Amino acid sequence: MTLGYRIIALRAVHSALWLTSALCVLQYAPEVLPCRATGSTLRADEPAPPDPVEAPFYADKSRLLVLLDEQLREQPIRTVEEWAQRRAHILASMQQVMGPLPGPERRCPLDVQVIEEVQADGLRRRKLTFAAEPGDRVPAYLLLPSGEPRRRPAILCLHQTHPLGKGEPAGLGDNPNKQYALELARRGYVTLAVDYPNFGEYRFDPYAHGYASATMKGIWNHIRAIDLLCALDEVDPQRVGAIGHSLGGHNSLFVAVFDERIKAVVSSCGFCSFPRYYEGNLAGWSHNGYMPRIREVYELDPAKMPFDFTELLAALAPRACLAIAPLDDANFAVEGVRECIAAARPVYELYGAGEHLVASYPDGKHDFPPAERERAYAWFDRWLADTAHRQAE
């Protein structure tokens, strides 16, 4: 297998260059499906059938306003339309490592089943499962605020590496710094916390089911979780965000890159550039819980990787993204976060949205302390919340 490995991406051809802005972007033409036990109506949407395409290899992933054409000649990017083609290359390159984004063959009715509902602290907490694909049900906690019935903003809350999985952000653990699904629900958001494969109550072997990585299975499950949120009567589908710490910090970025329904993202201790990750040793990214091709194909070498987090941040533009990167994070070197922010900023500025990309560098370790959580929640308030409604409650 070579760095020119052919991948699956969504259909697009450009008359002058090879990929259009439609490549690898989910398009939604809703199909209404029944939601069992909730009384809600759920929508499932099928992306266009994938076609195989190739993405060129960009050696310098910090120079983002450059596009490689079919002859691998550099072309300057001066417009949003031209950037969309580079963005398509980024999503294609991610799939070289993660495996292809699933298509209609894995989409099925969500068939939401509520296991229990608990009311406490002015909230309703529903334990439920939903069908991510045929034969696979994902456990989750849905937290619903009290107050007048209306459509509210919603946040997908992704957990860190912890045995409790979804239970920790939902408030069932003993670490108050990781209970962001609970705290955001108290703030007036509908929140959904789901288990990543082989955490909490969720057991699933992605490799036995045709996935090239647990990362891509997580992305697919999280896209389906957004399907669920957007279909709820309690949710405004135009105001959806994602948040996570550590494992959840990079998973929130991954799903947001592939699902543009997510309008605002917070990543706490979630990433740095690959060369800065443990001085370029990518072993931590290469086990079966992440992306084995990093070891098997790219030999743990950042210089051989088809993508980097510089590109992921830029691929979110112009949507709102807050990165929280403590100065003493032992997992993700703060210098590598600064490099990613600096590289992505020109893309945000291309959209006239430089203020939509923000980083916080608190004095601390690999944690999500109160001041940074408040910063994160205020970020969502800025981009998603209905202030008038919140003040009236």
What are the functions of these language-model segments?
Residues 342-343, 347-393:
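C-terminal catalytic histidine-bearing segment of alpha/beta-hydrolase fold enzymes
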Residues 102-149:
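N-terminal cap/lid segment of alpha/beta-hydrolase-fold proteins
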Residues 317, 323-332, 363:
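Conserved strand-to-loop "acid loop" that flanks and positions the catalytic carboxylate
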Residues 35, 39-96, 100, 389-393:
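N-terminal pre-domain segments of enzymes
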Residues 269-312, 331-341, 349-353:
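Mobile cap/lid helix-loop segments that gate and shape the active-site cleft of serine hydrolases
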Residues 150-151, 155-231, 258, 278-279, ...:
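Cap/lid segment of the alpha/beta-hydrolase catalytic domain
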